[in-house]
Every structure is written in structure tokens, then in C-alpha cells.
From Swiss-Prot:
The gene is nqrA. Signal peptide: none annotated. Belongs to the NqrA family. InterPro entries: NqrA, NQRA_2nd, NqrA_C_domain, NQRA_N. GO terms for biological process: sodium ion transport. It comes from Cellvibrio japonicus (strain Ueda107). This is Na(+)-translocating NADH-quinone reductase subunit A. It comes from the Bacteria.
Length: 447
């Protein structure tokens, strides 16, 4: 077991009840372009077309053979683009239950399938895009093989669902999914789980179960990769979420694409925080209707640390998100706040009197408590960075765009979520996720 001691468990109110209920029915779903790094779509449908569940919507111009399929049966109601025609989302009005059929196998035969058979079914169904490479967090090229595959079956994000609860309800599908993943690599399939978790076992001598404990980011794939199989410019691993492993298992045994998603609907502004059963790409306005407390609320697809604000063309559940967080917009300014003891305020540096009450939780808002300013190295990054890197030096190199130094300091191991805590504790209010992504894009483009 690997114990993470440096990090942060955010003391936020609104933790979800860990039991699954059916969520409000959604009438719209969408695929969001920003969920797929560097993807350039070639559309296979247009507005007004009727599509089936699992039908191709578009292909990736940059990665030959990768297609993106419909998460519902219905009608394409909108294709949204932004400045310079950047793809935002493709929206489908859910109607009927028509679905494409894919190759189906008996559970007993899965361990005997070839890597080519597994890959073909995943690519044709669109589930291939559930994998993300590290470095760069892109969909892998069909035909490629990773050094290892990481299954994220632990989640330490604030307000997250307990993966063990969701996996227990689909134990056979999860085990079948692991068996299939083992066919895709000659290396290890690392199933990263919480301490004392008893997850279903797949068939494959290369499947390894690794336990992590401690504070967030103990559940991040970046943390698992760093300790178990670090990457480099010449070494690639893949990551995949536990609910996608379940979907893979069900695809092969039923021949039908499973788009069910269990998400944690939680946060200080949620009336009844709990786990709800919905579907991939669900419209979050419809999912949260009648579920929130009064006030100006911000609905977030994903974690409060690194999720995406739900608004306009992006009012949908992200492809890789398993929670919907809701915070009150923090627009009010507090007079003479610097003279107050801060009983109802939180600080990583322990400068408020609330530090004397370690079990206290808070109604966090969206306020950043200040504007952007110079980066000040006061030791806050080191408090929340569990990886064996120099965070202050790395962040400085990212800010100034020194990609050579950033690579030497370990930026290729990282994704946006791995720097989310650094953003949260930053005295200068920098958003390190987008800064990291800009540097990674430059590194990849420059070869």
C-alpha cells in the first residue's frame, strides 16, 4: 500500500450519501469537444439527422481510425462552434431506444480474445476514446500498445462518489472489463484502489491490484503513474476510469453500448446530496432542476478543484466526469476581512482561528478571495504536492514557457488535475491547469 501524506482533503459541506438513486430524466445529451485534447472533428452527421445509440457522429482528423459515437438514440439538434470554428459540442435530443449492435461474446470466451478483436470492438463502438494517454492525455492511436494501463478505481476528490459502491452493483461487468484490458498490453494492468477495497478480479496474469491511502490526490491517475510506472517522452501509459471498465465489460457480453453514468450530485448548494444514475453527456440544467438551494448557483461538471463550469453550449456532463458539484457564486466583498479572526474561513496555511477546529467544514463559494498577482513562493505548493518533484520551480518554468526546464522537472507526468491543488493554494491566483496544457501542446508540437 502507498500512503499519501502531502495533499489536501477539502473540508467542504454537502458530501453525498453513498447510495444510488435514479436521477431526473434528461431529454438532451451531448459530446463536448474540450473533453478530447487536440481533437479536430470530421462530422459524419448534420443538424436534423436521426441517429442511433452507438452511431458515428464524427471522426478525429488528427488520429486516424478514432471515431466518436452517439450516447443516445434521437435527433441531432445542434452543433456548436466558437471563435475560429472551434468545436464546442454536438447536442442530441433523446428519442426512442434504437441502437447499433456490436460484436457479442460469452463471458467465458473473453480471456481468449486477441488484442485485435478487443480493439476492433472498442473502436467501432466509440469506447476506444475512454482511454487517455500519459503524457498528453489524448486518445491513443489504434494499433498502439501502452507500457501499462491504469484503472482508476479510487476517487479522493472532494464530494466524490465511492467507486466501490458503484462497482459492487456491476461486479461481473467490471471483472469482464479488466479481463479485456489485460489483452491490450503486454505490460501490467494496474487496478488502483482504496485501502481494504475488495474489488472483483479479472482474468489475466498481468492484472495487479495496488492500494492507495491518505489525502487527495491519492486517487489521481497522475499519482498512481508517478509511483508505479513513471512516463517519459518515449514511454506511454494509458488511463481509464472504473465506470468505463464496466461499460467495456457490458459491451462485449451484450453487444450494446452502455452509456449509464452514476455521478455524485453534491455540494453546499444541493438540497439532498447523493449518487444519481444518469447517462453520458447529460444536460446538467435538466439533471439539477429542482435539486438545488435558492441563490445564484454555479453548477460544475466534475470536481470543485478542476471541473468545468456548466453554461451555454457546455451545459452537459463531461466525458470523464463522475460528479456534479454545485457552489454559490461568491460575488459579495467582505468589509475589513483582514481584521477578522476567520472562524468561518479556511486556509491551508493555518492563518485563521478555524485551524483550532480541525473537524469543521465550510460552505465554500466560487470566490477566489483576491485578484491575480505575482507568484509568491511561501511553501504552499510543497504542502499539497505528493509527487517527487520541485513544485515551485516547475510552476515557474511553466508560467514563463520554459518547456525544456519543465520537462526536466517532470511536467510530462502531469495532467491538469495534478496541479489543481497548486491552483487552489496559490497566493497569486494562477490557473496552472491551462498553463500546463499550453506547455504540453508546445512540447508535443515541437517534437
Amino acid at each position: 500500500m502507498i500512503k499519501i501524506r502531502r495533499g489536501l482533503d477539502l473540508p467542504i459541506n454537502g458530501k453525498p450519501n453513498q447510495s444510488i438513486e435514479d436521477g431526473p430524466q434528461v431529454r438532451q445529451v451531448a459530446l463536448i469537444g474540450f473533453d478530447y485534447q487536440g481533437m479536430k472533428p470530421t462530422m459524419a452527421v448534420k443538424v436534423g439527422d436521426r441517429v442511433k445509440l452507438g452511431q458515428e457522429l464524427f471522426a478525429d482528423k488528427k488520429i486516424e481510425g478514432v471515431i466518436y459515437t452517439s450516447p443516445a438514440s434521437g435527433v441531432v439538434s445542434a452543433i456548436h462552434r466558437g471563435d475560429q470554428r472551434v468545436f464546442h459540442s454536438i447536442v442530441i435530443d433523446v428519442e426512442g431506444d434504437d441502437a447499433l449492435a456490436f460484436n457479442q461474446y460469452a463471458a467465458a470466451d473473453l480471456a481468449g480474445l486477441s488484442a485485435e478483436q478487443v480493439q476492433q470492438n472498442l473502436v467501432q463502438s466509440g469506447l476506444w476514446t475512454a482511454f487517455r494517454t500519459r503524457p498528453y492525455s489524448k486518445s491513443p492511436t489504434p494499433g498502439s500498445k501502452p507500457h501499462s494501463i491504469f484503472v482508476q478505481a479510487i476517487d479522493t476528490n472532494p464530494l466524490a462518489a465511492d467507486p466501490a459502491v458503484i462497482i459492487a452493483a456491476k461486479a461481473d461487468a467490471f471483472a469482464n472489463g479488466l479481463t479485456l484490458l489485460a489483452r491490450l498490453t503486454e505490460g501490467k494492468v494496474f487496478v488502483c484502489q482504496a485501502e481494504a477495497a475488495n474489488l472483483p478480479k479479472g482474468q489475466g496474469a498481468n492484472i495487479a491490484y495496488e492500494s492507495f491511502a491518505g489525502v487527495h490526490p491519492a486517487g489521481n491517475p497522475g499519482t498512481h503513474i508517478h509511483y508505479l510506472d513513471p512516463v517519459s517522452a518515449s514511454k506511454t501509459v494509458w488511463t481509464i476510469g472504473y465506470q468505463d471498465v464496466i461499460a467495456i465489460g457490458e459491451l462485449f457480453t451484450t453487444g450494446r453500448l452502455n452509456v449509464e453514468r452514476v455521478v455524485a450530485l453534491a455540494g453546499p448548494q444541493v438540497d439532498r446530496p447523493r449518487l444519481v444514475r444518469t447517462r453520458l453527456g447529460a444536460n446538467l440544467d435538466q439533471l439539477t432542476q429542482g435539486q438545488l438551494k435558492a441563490g445564484e448557483n454555479r453548477v460544475i461538471s466534475g470536481s470543485v478543484f478542476g471541473g468545468r463550469r456548466s453554461f451555454g453550449n457546455l451545459t452537459f456532463l463531461g466525458r470523464f466526469h463522475t460528479q456534479v458539484s454545485v457552489l454559490l457564486e461568491g460575488r459579495e466583498r467582505e468589509m475589513l476581512h483582514y481584521l477578522r479572526a476567520g472562524f468561518n474561513k479556511f486556509s491551508v496555511m493555518g492563518i485563521f482561528i478555524s485551524k483550532l477546529f480541525p473537524s469543521k467544514t465550510f460552505d465554500f463559494t466560487t470566490s477566489t478571495n483576491g485578484s491575480e498577482r505575482a507568484m509568491v513562493p511561501v511553501g504552499s505548493y510543497e504542502k499539497v504536492m505528493p509527487l517527487d518533484i520541485l513544485p515551485t520551480q516547475l510552476l515557474r518554468s511553466l508560467i514563463v514557457g520554459d518547456t525544456e526546464t519543465a520537462q526536466k522537472l517532470g511536467c510530462l507526468e502531469l495532467d491538469e488535475e495534478d496541479l489543481a491543488l497548486c491552483t487552489f493554494v496559490c497566493p497569486g491566483k494562477y490557473e496552472y491547469g491551462p498553463i500546463l496544457r499550453n506547455n504540453l501542446t508546445r512540447i508535443e508540437n515541437e517534437g
